[in-house]
């Protein structure tokens, strides 16, 4: 069934900033998709087109991206009468029309909005759930429910505290199914709230952009200690492990790292990549840390390689790889990390996201699907993670509706699959392993 009409508009993300929403119409109905937006963005990401008109939304309007859809992309796609199930053809057409390496003409936010809506329409056209359509597009015969990685303590660019490292996550790998993983996550979260309240006072339990707590602590180890305590109080020491997103590019300073980067600058306190690696190794030794994302700057390739070779845990590339097949190929070649963070808006189309995922999986990497800090109520990534069988997703704490929207969709998918539902559990790094 071909596209009858496409209409884009400006809506608001979870931070009150404008973002792109796309309505796509076929004879089967209306299909709507909204595009997320990141705060700590890698310099190699596809371009998110903003208006830069300082008199409107502090320059963050997306009316240009919306106009590119309504005036250029929509007429082209409608006139070509392509079937909505032809995801790759439609994505390629938009990418060719844009003609730039990083989608800077139309904006990745314009192309992605249409791409997501096409994917949703394609599923209905085929009469299958969205996760099944995505599995088909990726060539997967089975589907898998992921382990959720709940970001329960926020620091870095996501929070107004002193904490340098951006996310401290809990992964309920010992759960029997996704529903139990949600219950464990929620119970640990509420225990953590009480632990923080007792130690730092009630105002320390205000939440950050992704629903995690942002107590005013400086020591990253204290974040891990709080998690360990909360996991123990909830009674899940044997079922929950810890993940971190350091987002080290945010505090990389001329070859070194500043773990107090939110204070006035003082080069005497900077530490070397080796010192930072030793700090991570002490965390791994003292706490159940099984995954560290962006431990070093996006161009500090040597430090990545050295750490991945010796750490013995999952090392996730986000700013390093930016869901870009060229960066992933380089990281595979240099053995820089062993897991890809998959963010659809870093690359800007469904087809390229699938290619990035397949490339990582083909090289023995894990893949973690991810939200952005500026989110919407759109639940596409919940179906994406199931269809791609990546086994792990991070989409915030069990708090704030734009985060829960994804987790709740995963609950529905598990329920729909019934006895056929398979949960990644402790195999979250390689859930397809037989």
UniProtKB/Swiss-Prot annotation:
This protein's pathway: Carbohydrate degradation; glycolysis; pyruvate from D-glyceraldehyde 3-phosphate: step 4/5
Residues found modified as Phosphoserine: 27, 254, 263, 272, 291
Active site as annotated: 210, 343
N6-(2-hydroxyisobutyryl)lysine carried by residues: 228, 281
PTM summary: ISGylated.
Region (Epitope recognized by CAR antibodies): 56-63
Region (Required for repression of c-myc promoter activity): 97-237
Residues reported in the UniProt entry to bind substrate: 158, 167, 293, 318, 370-373, 394
PANTHER family per record: ALPHA-ENOLASE, ENOLASE
Protein name (Swiss-Prot/TrEMBL): Alpha-enolase
Originating organism: Homo sapiens (Human)
Taxonomic lineage from the root: Eukaryota, Metazoa, Chordata, Craniata, Vertebrata
Name of encoding gene: ENO1
